[in-house]
Amino acid sequence: TDNEEFRVAAVKDRVDTTMQVWMGLTMGCAKCHSHKYDPISQSDYYSFYAFFNQTEDADRGDDSPTLFTPTEVQARSFDAAGRTVKLLEARHKASPESGDERVKVSKTRLENVRKTIANTPIMRDLAANKQRTTKIHNRGNFLDPDDAVEAAVPELFGPLPEGAPRNRAGVADWLLQPQNPLTARVTVNRIWARLFGIGIVETEEDFGTQGLPPSHPELLDWLAVDFREHEWSLKQLIRSIVLSSTYQQAALITPEKQAADPRNRLLSRSPRVRLSAETVRDQALSLANLLTQKVGGASVMPPQPAGVWKSTYSGLKWENATGPDRYRRSLYTYLKRTSPHPALLTFDAGSGEVCQIRRIRTNTPLQALVTLNEVSFVEAAGALANRAGKFRGSDHADSLKPLFQMVLIRPPKFPELARLVALYETMQQEFPEGSEAQRMLVQASGSKTSDAAMIAVANVLLNLDETLTKP
């Protein structure tokens, strides 16, 4: 591979991502020619590119350079282990008795603590005497350089703050300065979209002339100013939104509201949208008490169908995780960009090739097949059935009531309970005691119970619209 080609592609991706994430601008359109719709020239693009063009980059297999980034708890453990090693070494030097073994054990303990702490990949600037000259790329081709440019932000948005360094730290200051209203607006809009299902500006990724106008411009501006005045606190922003009377409305829709506000752009009711891909899986595991609570660590490989994931060059294989790693949060799922996890992809998760600002939510039959048949959901149903079995009584309803409440966090209404009982009795006929069908379902679910009918009912409850939808 051409090392410089990949380095340039990575730098351009950082430029595009920075401007789209923080400014809501499709600046990547200006890498080959001046932007067709927004007032951003090709010179603006490469002047901004110059800020990111001075970092140590190479097409290496490792993540260097990295920064040692322990959590507060990890830092205390690491410091305590380090102090123990220093103390034992000092005592060893001052004592005629041998203490080599104790020092060795303590150093091993220190190294084990170090291994649990993340090393975060960072960008480190080149030394002053090694700085690169940035040139405009004709038609975006790095092999066809044109005029040299100096590092600068797009003219449309004003210069760097007075006294700010002409590097990436200066860009950060520029993004957050009060004279730049876009950063706060774009961030507030993104949080609003996560809570309401759609942003005040629907096109989260494009605040330019081709993006859609805000449905409530004054509200967007007020939230942006309030966000900045509260020192960019996301916690405060989320609290102010979810405690509002607008958010706390009922999600019920009437014919009048449907006619006047079909997409809820006027906020006539509370949002009701399907959970994200990762949350759909994590919720099922959490309801079944299977979700592993561990924070941080290496990526894991939860179950997926055989043959989906193959690596031609490295020989790496998808090894279905076992034990606690099997049920880690979906955030930790190993991501191969050419072959994302199929269950997550079916629910609109991104492939990881580029930064995805907004997921377009789809509704397909394939999604129901995932929640009914995918291994994680079947095993979650098995664990739920096992929990429900603890409430078993003389009547099927004795187990079905708590099972329903475990999943939907409310007691079932009488017609709902009647349908559940009828479903359970039907499933008993589908999976009779001692049958091969019963054995296969119980085995697939990993459940301790042999009640295949209860597993099937739990599976149906996990697949309900009410379960998969944010109320």
Q: Which residue ranges define each predicted feature?
A:
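Sequence context surrounding c-type heme c attachment/ligation sites in exported
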Residues: T1-G82, L344, Q356
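Primarily short, surface-exposed interaction patches in extracytoplasmic proteins
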Residues: V8-A10, D38-P39, D79-D325, L344, ...
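Active-site Gly/Thr loop motif
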Residues: R329, K336-F347
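Short, surface-exposed polybasic-aromatic patches that bind anionic ligands, especially phosphate groups
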Residues: V457
